[in-house]
């Protein structure tokens, strides 16, 4: 796999956004907001798990993600690829296959005891591990996985995702504070631009989504349920 034979990052972001729209992984609804795991409302929702059911798109995006990591981290930067339970497991396996590296996965909670209680597969002390997930919002769950990886004696300074919300400034800063670099293919801004170009949603909905993206905390406060 030769990184220079692929599109630049901006074009890969546009193509990724288009593929997510094509498989209807993107949902916008400002009138009846989605409730996130945090309990906060959002007019946007994305389901990257759907990608595993679309082989051509899945393969293309895994090529894109692998190339992005190689461009930004290097050709020989890792010894092990770890998928985060649950959504990151298939994508971790696909990236590991492309890089010809061992694959492991990290549990959300320990199973049993000892420093390897959250790790399935073989992860050796000193190995340089790339954590792969489907998406990130604020980076919080990634740090929990990184902590579990580091407990084994391995190192983890990089995480790769297909989709990053790209609207919460603390995402990359919180990861960076723990020595973790985030690699991603596209954000809500890329999806919004491509949705406008395709006419995927009506102008009122797209306008409401843009308002949210510009100040998500204020939008969430204004749309909180009592």
Swiss-Prot record:
Pfam families: Pribosyltran. Its EC number is 2.4.2.10. SUPFAM superfamilies: PRTase-like (SSF53271). Pathway: Pyrimidine metabolism; UMP biosynthesis via de novo pathway; UMP from orotate: step 1/2. It catalyses: orotidine 5'-phosphate + diphosphate = orotate + 5-phospho-alpha-D-ribose 1-diphosphate. Keywords: Glycosyltransferase, Magnesium, Pyrimidine biosynthesis, Transferase. GO terms for molecular function: magnesium ion binding; orotate phosphoribosyltransferase activity. Signal peptide: none annotated. Orotate binds at residue 137. Its cofactor is Mg(2+). GO terms for biological process: 'de novo' UMP biosynthetic process; pyrimidine nucleobase biosynthetic process. It comes from the Bacteria. 5-phospho-alpha-D-ribose 1-diphosphate binds at residues 107-108, 111, 133-141. Homodimer. HAMAP family: PyrE. Catalyzes the transfer of a ribosyl phosphate group from 5-phosphoribose 1-diphosphate to orotate, leading to the formation of orotidine monophosphate (OMP). Belongs to the purine/pyrimidine phosphoribosyltransferase family. PyrE subfamily. This is Orotate phosphoribosyltransferase. It comes from Dinoroseobacter shibae (strain DSM 16493 / NCIMB 14021 / DFL 12). The lineage of its organism: Bacteria, Pseudomonadati, Pseudomonadota, Alphaproteobacteria, Rhodobacterales. The gene is pyrE.
């Amino acid at each position: 796999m030769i990184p220079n034979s692929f599109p630049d990052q901006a074009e890969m972001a546009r193509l990724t956004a288009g593929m997510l729209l094509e498989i209807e992984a993107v949902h916008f609804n400002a009138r009846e907001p989605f409730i996130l795991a945090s309990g906060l409302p959002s007019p946007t929702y994305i389901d990257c798990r759907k990608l595993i059911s679309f082989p051509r798109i899945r393969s293309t995006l895994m090529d894109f993600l692998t190339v992005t990591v190689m461009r930004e981290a290097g050709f020989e930067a890792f010894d092990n690829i770890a998928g985060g339970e649950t959504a990151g497991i298939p994508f971790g396996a696909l990236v590991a296959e492309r890089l010809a590296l061992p694959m492991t996965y990290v549990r959300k909670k320990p199973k049993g005891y000892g420093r390897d209680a959250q790790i399935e597969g073989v992860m050796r002390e000193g190995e340089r591990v790339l954590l792969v997930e489907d998406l990130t919002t604020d980076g919080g769950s990634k740090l929990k996985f990184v902590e579990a990886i580091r407990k084994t004696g391995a190192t983890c300074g990089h995480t790769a995702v297909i989709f990053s919300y790209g609207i919460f400034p603390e995402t990359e800063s919180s990861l960076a504070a723990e020595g973790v670099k985030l690699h991603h293919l596209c954000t809500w801004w890329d999806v919004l631009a491509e949705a406008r170009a395709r006419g995927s949603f009506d102008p009122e909905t797209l306008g409401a989504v843009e308002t949210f993206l510009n100040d998500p905390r204020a939008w969430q406060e204004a749309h909180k349920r009592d």
